[in-house]
Amino acid sequence: MQQYSALVRRRYAEIASGDLGYIPDAIGCALKALDAVAADEQLPPAVREQAAYAAANLLVSDYVDD
């Protein structure tokens, strides 16, 4: 867990403790978040590209795994 940001670790702890709701469709949740980052024109292009690349890889892995 230490490789992840403090915010990710905090949300993980909140979900694990039941303080924050768990979303069963984790890939769908991640894709929505990554797509929102990729679409945000106020963010630096490098950040948007990184999010788009991660989302595309999730889409490919989701279809390959089915």
UniProtKB/Swiss-Prot annotation:
This is UPF0253 protein NT01EI_0864. InterPro entries: UPF0253. It comes from the Bacteria. Pfam families: UPF0253. Belongs to the UPF0253 family. It comes from Edwardsiella ictaluri (strain 93-146).
